[in-house]
C-alpha cells in the first residue's frame, strides 16, 4: 500500500517537488529497483487473453518475460538497474499482511461468482486481485538477472528501505518503486512508473524529498509523522483526519504526540494500543543492507545459459531470446559512457535540464534537518 494519498498530496501542496521525464533522460544513471513491486506489475500486465503467460507445464512465465524485456529496455536507454528483493517483513507489518489475506479470500469468492455469471470483465478484475509474488517468482527472476549480467541484492527486510539507503549513500541516483513510503524511509529521489508497460505511455515521475520538506516546512521526523497520519502499512491512522487536515495539524503542532494531546478524543479517537512510536522508529531507523559493503557490477549476458533456462525450461522462443541477448549486449557498449554531470559536483535538489526555481527566504534554515533520519552520508 505504501502511504495513502501521499502522491496526490505532494502534487497538490508541493508540485515543484515532482518532475516528469522521458526514460531517455536517465542515460548513465544507476537506479535501485524494488524487485517485488516490479514482479507484481509484470504478473498483472504481461498477459494473453486476460490470463498470465504459462508454459506447457502450466508454470507462470509472465514475470520472466516482463523482467527480461523491461530490463533490456532500461539498459537500451542507458539506465543501469540494480534490483533489490524483499527480506523478512517487519513484525509491524503483520496486521497489514493479515488484511491482504482477507482481501484475497474475498476476491476468490467474488471471482467464483463472476465466473458462474459469465461476467468476463469482473473475472479479469478479481483474477488480478489474487495476484501474489511468491518465493518461486523471486528465485526465478534472480536466476534470470544473474544470467543477464544484472546485479541484484537481498534486503534484510523491506526492499524500499534498502533502496533508500543506497540512494542516501550515493550508490545509485534514485529508488524506483510505486510505493511512496520509499520517501518516508528517506530516499532523496523516488522514481515512479520506470517499469510500467510502454503501452501505458506513462511519463516517469521523479519526487525530490528535499523539495517536499522545503515546500511543507517540515523536517524528516515531522514528514514521517505526517505519513503515519495519512496511513501506512505499519500502524493504523486516526480516523477522520484527511490529507489536508493532517498537513495543517503537523505544520501547527510539529509532532503526532502534540497533535494527540490537542485533539478532541470524542471527535478523533486514537486507535487502541496505537503503534505509532514503533512505526516512527521503523521509518527512521529501518533494517537495511550496508551500502558500503555493496559492489555493483554489470557484466556480459550468458547467452547459452539464458537459452537453456528461458527456452529449454520455460519454453520461450529461442529466436526472440537470442534477439533480446543481442540487444542487451549492444546496450552495454553504449551504457559504459557516463553522464557529464557525474564528473562535477551537483548542487541543489533538482539536478536536471530544467532550471531550478528560486528558493523562498528562510528556506536554508528549514533544510537544515533534511535527511536527519538517514544513517548514511551521501557519496561523492
Curated annotation (Swiss-Prot):
Q: Could you tell me where the Basic residues compositional bias lies?
A: 363-380
Q: What is its main location?
A: nucleus
Q: Which residues carry this modification: Phosphothreonine?
A: 336
Q: Which Pfam families match?
A: XPG_I, XPG_N
Q: Which cofactor does it need?
A: Mg(2+)
Q: Which InterPro entries match?
A: 5-3_exonuclease_C_sf, Flap_endonuc, HhH2, PIN-like_dom_sf, XPG-I_dom, XPG/Rad2, XPG_CS, XPG_DNA_repair_N
Q: Mind telling me which GO cellular component terms the entry cites?
A: chromosome, telomeric region; mitochondrion; nucleolus; nucleoplasm; nucleus; protein-containing complex
- Annotated residues for binding of Mg(2+) 2: 179, 181, 233
- Modified residue N6-acetyllysine is at which positions? 80, 354, 375, 377, 380
Give the multimer and partner information.
Interacts with PCNA. Three molecules of FEN1 bind to one PCNA trimer with each molecule binding to one PCNA monomer. PCNA stimulates the nuclease activity without altering cleavage specificity. The C-terminal domain binds EP300; can bind simultaneously to both PCNA and EP300. Interacts with DDX11; this interaction is direct and increases flap endonuclease activity of FEN1. Interacts with WDR4; regulating its endonuclease activity. Interacts with POLB.
Family named by the database record? Belongs to the XPG/RAD2 endonuclease family. FEN1 subfamily.
Q: From the Swiss-Prot or TrEMBL record, give the protein name.
A: Flap endonuclease 1
Q: Which organism is it from?
A: Bos taurus (Bovine)
Amino acid at each position: 500500500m505504501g502511504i495513502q494519498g501521499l502522491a496526490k498530496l505532494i502534487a497538490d501542496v508541493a508540485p515543484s517537488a515532482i518532475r516528469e521525464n522521458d526514460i531517455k533522460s536517465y542515460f548513465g544513471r544507476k537506479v535501485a529497483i524494488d524487485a517485488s513491486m516490479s514482479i507484481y506489475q509484470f504478473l498483472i500486465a504481461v498477459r494473453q487473453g486476460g490470463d498470465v503467460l504459462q508454459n506447457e507445464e502450466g508454470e507462470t512465465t509472465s514475470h520472466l518475460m516482463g523482467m527480461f524485456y523491461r530490463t533490456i529496455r532500461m539498459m537500451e536507454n542507458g539506465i543501469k538497474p540494480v534490483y533489490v528483493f524483499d527480506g523478512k517483513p517487519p513484525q509491524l507489518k503483520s496486521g497489514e499482511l493479515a488484511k491482504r489475506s482477507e482481501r484475497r479470500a474475498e476476491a476468490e469468492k467474488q471471482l467464483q461468482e463472476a465466473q458462474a455469471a459469465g461476467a468476463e470483465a469482473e473475472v479479469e478484475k478479481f483474477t488480478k486481485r489474487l495476484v501474489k509474488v511468491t518465493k518461486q517468482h523471486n528465485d526465478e527472476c534472480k536466476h534470470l538477472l544473474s544470467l543477464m549480467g544484472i546485479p541484484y541484492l537481498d534486503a534484510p527486510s523491506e526492499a524500499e528501505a534498502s533502496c533508500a539507503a543506497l540512494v542516501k549513500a550515493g550508490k545509485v541516483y534514485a529508488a524506483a518503486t510505486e510505493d511512496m513510503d520509499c520517501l518516508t524511509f528517506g530516499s532523496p529521489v523516488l522514481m515512479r512508473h520506470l517499469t510500467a508497460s510502454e503501452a501505458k505511455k506513462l511519463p516517469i515521475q521523479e519526487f525530490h524529498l528535499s523539495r517536499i520538506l522545503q515546500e511543507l516546512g517540515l523536517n524528516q521526523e515531522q514528514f514521517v509523522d505526517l505519513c503515519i497520519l495519512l496511513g501506512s502499512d505499519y500502524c493504523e491512522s486516526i480516523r477522520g483526519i484527511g490529507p489536508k487536515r493532517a498537513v495543517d495539524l503537523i505544520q501547527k503542532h510539529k509532532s503526532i504526540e502534540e497533535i494527540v494531546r490537542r485533539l478532541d478524543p470524542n471527535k478523533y479517537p486514537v486507535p487502541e494500543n496505537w503503534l505509532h512510536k514503533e512505526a516512527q522508529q521503523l521509518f527512521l531507523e529501518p533494517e537495511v543492507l550496508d551500502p558500503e559493503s555493496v559492489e555493483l557490477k554489470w557484466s556480459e549476458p550468458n547467452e547459452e545459459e539464458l537459452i537453456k533456462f528461458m527456452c529449454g525450461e520455460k519454453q520461450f522462443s529461442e529466436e526472440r531470446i537470442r534477439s533480446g541477448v543481442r540487444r542487451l549486449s549492444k546496450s552495454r557498449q553504449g551504457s559504459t559512457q557516463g553522464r557529464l554531470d557525474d564528473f562535477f559536483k551537483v548542487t541543489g535538489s533538482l539536478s536536471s535540464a530544467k532550471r531550478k526555481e528560486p528558493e523562498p527566504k528562510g528556506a536554508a534554515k528549514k533544510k537544515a534537518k533534511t535527511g536527519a533520519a538517514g544513517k548514511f552520508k551521501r557519496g561523492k
